């Protein structure tokens, strides 16, 4: 067995349990990572997520909406910016060339690849067909290009290149780097860019949006999940810089809908992203949702006592590029026939408040 194979087998994944929605609320039921891990190595006990062993397939990264799992994306952001970013599997030996040797390339989500394209101008994935054919991980790299197009980022998809032949890869390296293909020059460039930290890049790009949203909604409340970032906020930023986009294009992003509500405020109080708001004024109550603030963690569905919140389709590029508060439910004030208290509900024939309904 070659050294590159041993390195690939180690493939450790960094786990940030404090970011998990299960750590935030005992009512949360999200278990996407557990369901998708092919080895059954991910456990969630007492709200704490842990990984026993890891083969580096990266499926947990694709599944998690809260960036609990992390492998090579921060390292990719730190690569030198004097040329395109080239990423290959660790089973290949490009140690003397400016290539990022990573764990399985399927760890990189379409959104991460779009961010890398924005940063480097072009991203090349060397998915050698021979190596991938013998690998236990079932991955379709062109699928990431298709997802970019479905999210209205066709210009980014064009700058994401997939190379499957070794000869084509060698030719590409020679054409784009020439005399950079030496360890000495490569290491010199790496040290020159060491200050370009991934954490600083991503946080700075988000700080303006977070401040703006805090000023308009619950400015007195601090955002609970400052430990991580909303992936939809990053998509919003990409749309702002996208050269061409169709505002009416439907995207494969979940839209929150409501079938019935009694405006108890459980979802509003517990949403870690402050993406849900209930406003009462002049005898009316409105339940609203912000598509960009929302991280699609599903906690609101878990805690709704009426089971009235659901995921649906129908979001467009415009919903994320030009976000606004989308009304999910409205109701007029009414007086409980039993106790006389004012209450709200979307059930037209309901004459009792929730307390009297449950008590009597």
Mark where each language-model region is.
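Accessory beta->alpha helical hairpin/"wing" motif in late/C-terminal subdomains of nucleic-acid enzymes
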Residues: 48-49, 288-290
């Amino acid at each position: 067995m070659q050294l590159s194979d041993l390195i690939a087998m180690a493939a450790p994944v960094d786990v940030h349990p404090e970011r998990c929605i299960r750590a935030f609320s005992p009512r949360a039921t999200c278990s996407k990572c557990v369901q998708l891990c092919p080895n059954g190595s991910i456990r969630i006990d007492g709200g704490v997520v842990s990984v026993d062993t890891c083969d580096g397939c990266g499926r947990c990264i694709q599944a998690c909406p809260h960036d609990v799992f992390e492998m090579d994306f921060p390292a990719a952001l730190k690569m030198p910016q004097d040329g395109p970013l080239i990423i290959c599997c660790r089973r290949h030996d490009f140690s003397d060339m400016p290539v990022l040797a990573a764990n399985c390339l399927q760890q990189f989500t379409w959104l991460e690849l779009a961010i890398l394209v924005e940063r480097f101008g072009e991203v090349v994935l060397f998915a050698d067909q021979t190596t991938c054919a013998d690998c236990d991980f079932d991955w379709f790299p062109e699928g990431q290009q298709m997802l970019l197009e479905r999210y209205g980022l066709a210009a980014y998809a064009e700058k994401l290149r997939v190379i499957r032949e070794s000869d084509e890869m060698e030719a590409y390296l020679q054409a784009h780097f020439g005399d950079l293909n030496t360890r000495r020059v490569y290491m010199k460039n790496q040290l020159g860019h060491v200050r370009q930290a991934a954490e600083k890049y991503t946080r700075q790009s988000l700080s303006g949006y977070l401040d703006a949203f805090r000023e308009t909604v619950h400015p007195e409340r601090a955002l609970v999940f400052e430990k991580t970032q909303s992936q939809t906020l990053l998509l919003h930023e990409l749309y702002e810089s996208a050269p061409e986009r169709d505002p009416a294009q439907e995207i494969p992003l979940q839209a929150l809908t409501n079938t019935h509500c009694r405006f108890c405020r459980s979802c509003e109080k517990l949403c870690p992203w402050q993406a849900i708001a209930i406003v009462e004024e002049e005898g009316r109550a409105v339940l609203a949702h912000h598509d960009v603030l929302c991280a699609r963690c599903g906690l609101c569905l878990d805690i709704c006592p009426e089971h009235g919140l659901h995921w649906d389709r129908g979001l467009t590029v415009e919903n994320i590029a030009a976000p606004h508060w989308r009304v999910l439910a409205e109701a007029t004030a009414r007086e409980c026939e039993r106790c006389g208290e004012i209450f709200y509900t979307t059930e037209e024939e309901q004459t009792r408040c929730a307390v009297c309904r449950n008590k009597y």
